Amino acid sequence: MECARLTRYGLLSVTGDDARAFLHAQLTKDIENLPPGRATLAGWCSAKGRLLASLLVIPAAQGFLLQLSRDLAPGVARKLSMFVLRAKVRIADVSETWAQFGVWGDGATGPAEPNAISHRGNIITVHVGEARYLVLGPANEVALAPTTGEESWTLQEIRAGRPLITAATQDKFVPQMVNFDELGGVDFRKGCYPGQEIVARAQYRGQVKRRMVGARAPAGVDLRPGQEFKGGTVIDVAPAEDGSELLAVMPI
């Protein structure tokens, strides 16, 4: 079993009586009908349908937790708060006070079903993929000993085809370009959310001309998220044997 402390992810807390309805109106996923004990991928888009953040939405006490890129957390919290208006919703950036770990491999245990959540006190475990689990909770309560660096978890995410929108790739891609429709992060039957018309039009009119693919790069090739190459754009990259592995949006 491998365990890595995850520091590139931030975490927002969305609480209050109207938290579910508020997120349902903002995100690409049907949050109103999210089953109890289930997390989901979702996107938050601009009015032009471009992803401002890729999110893992996790039901928690009195509301939800939103996992996203750490470099986006303060800005997303601030901009989301602008839409609260009179709703009974409180949005807080808890990135500094919560700890997140990735656990995977032989011996890793947690909820059996994909996206299922288990709770042990304030500690939450989310099944994010085959024998891969996200464990998070208040920093003073999570007692896990890392066995490897965070880049090892990033490599697992890349191999699973799970994109992370960062400051370098923010507001550049509609959700389908990073395969959010295939990953279950978009619900085309739900009502309006920011950018919904453009996202739906791209889907039903066949206007998605770029898609995210996995690729390898040889040793010595320096790649970073947001970097453009041969018509494509790097979404994420991590060291691997004899080079690196990456996710990139490419023409199709």
What is each residue range found by the language model?
Residues E2-R5, G10-L11, L56-A160:
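Acidic, low-complexity central loop/insert segments
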Residues E150, Q156-D181, D222:
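Short, conserved active-site entrance elements at the starts or edges of catalytic domains
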Residues G43, D106-H119, P218-G232:
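Short amphipathic alpha-helix segments
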